[in-house]
Amino acid sequence: MYSEPVTAVHCFCFWGERIVLVDVTGRGISIPGGHILTGESLLNGLRRELAEEACITLDSPALLGAVECDHSANPAFGPSLGYPRLASQLLYAGTVNRILPFTAKYETSRRIFVPALKCPEQFNEWDAVMQAAFEGALAWMAG
């Protein structure tokens, strides 16, 4: 289903009719998520990233799909970046079960709750991959 290793996980987090977005330094407005730490399970990494970036917890997140990251043709890629040449990033959807007080302690400067259908307008770098994942997240939410 996806190439190993998985280096990052991200999630469309639903709170009622809204989606949680975060403003991440260097990335802009996006869904929360980030890199998996060495030895960390994918779901534990996702839970940690959501707690750090958005100060939320989720009920059972559902895997929507994977994005394969192939740096073979990237002239800027090198071992010093600390990433493998071929890896995957996973995209999830989930329902927020707890909202904690927001603290801009990690990479995020703010957390916002936007109507789900307005998510593409708010997002910093929306593309065909995010659109497909978003449609999958909406379908998952609709049951």
Regions found by a protein language model. Give the residues of each.
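A short coil-to-beta-strand element that immediately follows conserved catalytic motifs
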Residues: T57-V67
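NUDIX/MutT-family hydrolases
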Residues: Q89-T95, F102-A133
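Conserved Nudix-box catalytic region and its N-terminal flanking loop in Nudix hydrolases
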Residues: F14-E53
